[in-house]
Structure formats: structure tokens, C-alpha cells
Amino acid sequence: MVWDHGPTGRTVLTLSTPTTFAAKGAVHAFAALGRPLAPDVPHVIWAHGWGQDHHAFLALARSLERAAHHTLFDFPGFGQSPAPPQKADGSAWGTADYADAVADWLASLPRGRRIWVGHSFGGRVGLRLAVRHPAAVDAMVLVGSHGLRPRRSLVARARIFLRVRMFKTLRLLEKFGVDVSARKAKYGSADYRSAGSMRPVFVKVVSEDQTEDVKAIRMPMVIIYGALDDQAPPDIGERLSKLIPGSSLSILPGLDHYTVLTDGGPQVAHAVAKLLEP
């Protein structure tokens, strides 16, 4: 693993000249702010959602700047981090690969109290990290997190079934040389259509279900969802809170998948601040 030391202290590390670390063959760009990293200084790791980058959490991290050292990732494939390489078997990265890379990096750092804050995809990776590397962090805040398969109505399940059947038909037509790219774009989700070179990762990640795995998690966990979130419905949070012993759940009225980070920012910051208390 390679660690590129950038400036420390209370100045945000600009990603115009990104500070990076390399783990599991992937380069991770990141920004840092707050107190210098040291064994007696808490460390908050902010993990953004799919299609976002470190800026998603920058305002929240700044609000807690004096309380801890803060690292804000650009996960491989987002922001200024290049896409992760294919694995040796030719398959795409999944959440386990992202979690393993982060764990490798954390193992190289001074060991203070660590808190993982993950939104959406960042929550998926956090759950995987908590299961595969339970000693890597001490507590988590999950915000609008994915990780469990959402429960859908009969109508929604029928629509998904028809969409899957259409994709299978399109793949068959591709084998005969038919250009079906426009049709694929039509039937894919917005994230699927915009995924580009990250599409294999996206397809793998959204197919994962961590329901059985998360039962093994034993750490303080605060779970926050927006009541109007239609991308990571609060039902996921309700199930997570039942599966993870000792976790707490807050569902914020009137907020969706993204406003839970802005209008709901004070609640998220409060949850992190409570976990930072000695």
C-alpha cells in the first residue's frame, strides 16, 4: 500500500492536487480537515453515496472540525478517484472490495477512536466494513443507507420483472449484432444510465443483500433516514435497527434521500458529536 502524505492541520486538502492512498490496486483520493491525526484524536471517516464525492459531507465535517480529524473520501470511480480495476477473476468490485481497501488503509494509521459516517452507497460499504473488519472502526452513523433489499409492492415487483425480461431479450439481440444501446438506456435506472465505466460495479453492488451478514455487527450504530426517501426507503432503516443489536433509528419527517444531508444535517452532526463524546 502507498500512502502519500499531504499537509495536515485545519486546512481542507483540495482535490485539485489530490492526496491519495492506494489499496487493493485502487487509488483513493481524499480531503482531510480538523485536528492533526494522532492516537489521542478521534477520527471521523465520511463516505459518500453513489454518484457523489467528498463534497456531499464537506459542510457537516466543517461543522465538527475542532472535535476530530476528518477524512472525506472520493471512493474509487467517483470524484477524482479513478475507477477500480477488474479483479483477477475478471469480475467487478463489490462492497467487500471497497471495505477491504479501506480497512487496509486504516490499519496504516494512528489508532484513535474512529467513527464511520456513510450515506447511501457509503452506508453499504460501512456495513460490509463492520462485518468483515469489526476492529477497524468503533461506531457508525448510517444516513439513507442501502444494504438490504427494499420491500416492494406487487405492482413494483411486476415492473421490475418486466424490465429484467426486457434486458435479457436485449442481451440476446446483442449476440446477433443488433445495436440495443438506446433501448438499454431507456429501461435502466438513472444511476444505471449514468454509471458509464462503473456500470459493472453498480450492477454488482445493487444485487447485494446484507440481511444475514449485518446480524453479526456489534458496535454503536445510529441509523437516520428521511421519511420521504424513495431511493433508500425508511423501511430499510427499520429492518436494520431490528437486525443490529443496540442500534438507534431516527426517521426525519419531510426529508428525502438528499435533503436528509442538508435539512437533516443538524441531526446527523448531533449524532456524530454524541459518538465523539468520551
What residue ranges belong to the model's regions?
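Conserved HGGG/HGGXW glycine-rich cap/lid loop of the alpha/beta-hydrolase fold
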Residues: 33-82
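Flexible "cap/lid" loop of the alpha/beta hydrolase fold
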Residues: 127-132, 137-171
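Conserved alpha/beta-hydrolase catalytic His-Asp/Glu region
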Residues: 166-219
